Amino acid sequence: GKILFLVDDAIFTADFSIADIEKILDNNRDALGFSLRLGKNTQYCYMMDRKQPQPEFTSPADGILKFNWTKSELDFAYPLEVSSSIYRLAELFPLLLRVNFNNPNYLEGGLVRFVGQFVASHPMLLCYDTSVAFCNPVNLVQTVSLNNRVSSNKKYTVDELAALFDSGWVINTRFFDHVIPESCHQEMELSFEKREAK
């Protein structure tokens, strides 16, 4: 089996097939996982606020990239993340049993502690040529990692977004169709539309 991790600010920008990703993972046993947030387009590391070098890619299938995360930098060197990646349960389930968590930050922090055990056995990571997901960090909704970098735009506070929703407005997700972000995390303006009456 496989497991897909997602967080509440993850946005999909293009169609993808989980069934295809499962097959690719099965055919690339040296890969730890498949990142939906990485690609040749992710040339900037938002969390560190700097450009990131691209790893040396190979292409095991059409539109798919493979790289050695143990020889990479920044986002490309961070293989265990919970924002938008798919992993095999065989590798992840034993870790999940050992991690004490009650939110995504604690889960990711707990998983990262075990990354060293995969350096020899699973040094590769897979992704699409162009990422199909990114996180839009418009606000901070948790209190355990207050140093997480987020937008300072006051119109996207939790209270402001809740007020818009209560007034019948929702985020227009079509606005993000085919967006090609330069980073795994990228602040983007939100577009709103009136919620359809049911």
What residue ranges belong to the model's regions?
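Short beta-strand-to-loop acidic/aromatic patch adjacent to the donor-nucleotide binding site
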Residues: 1-11
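Hydrophobic/aromatic beta-strand patches that form the interior of the parallel beta-sheet core
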Residues: 4, 32-34, 126
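Generic detection of intrinsically disordered/low-complexity segments and helix-coil linkers/edges
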Residues: 6, 61-63, 169
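Short, well-ordered beta-to-alpha junction loops that form the rim of enzyme active sites
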Residues: 8, 36-39, 128-130
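Conserved catalytic core of nucleotide-sugar-dependent glycosyltransferases
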Residues: 14-101
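C-terminal catalytic/acceptor-binding lobe
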Residues: 84, 90-198
